[in-house]
């Protein structure tokens, strides 16, 4: 507020989406036309059974669809796919786009899979056809990896959650995904950008080496 002259601290009922009118009023007061809602709940694994994953994601997506309906298209949102059931994940994305979603959310690691895994191709194909972004939020859906990196380094979320975005971006750029699904826009959220130069430097080195250059 000191630098912008605007107070972005919203009342609880607006922040927690308990009162949509209050949220819209706060947006008006701060000069914000549109917001994109992204959850914190899903930065970690929410279920280890497909049917539970579907139930949690479907409930969340229906809630956000109702919020969007009340907002006159001002509260867009990120759909959460139940990635343990890829058929259901595609169905959820299709529903979400029809009800105000502008992106599909993913974690840098999904269980025992990384994002270039062909398992996710049906979801990427749907995002490519629907024209929505893939929003990779800091997170980790592999409990073992999260415990190993977080607990082993003093409990820090930096290696366990944030650095995973750098690894995901690096892997995606080296994969066939950008060429296979050219309409997808990728976003890496809440991971800052200090890792970008390191990723770009390493990619340049690898690409030069693959072409036989020093």
Give, region by region, the residue ranges found by the protein language model.
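Helix-coil boundary/capping segments in enzymes
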Residues: 1-214
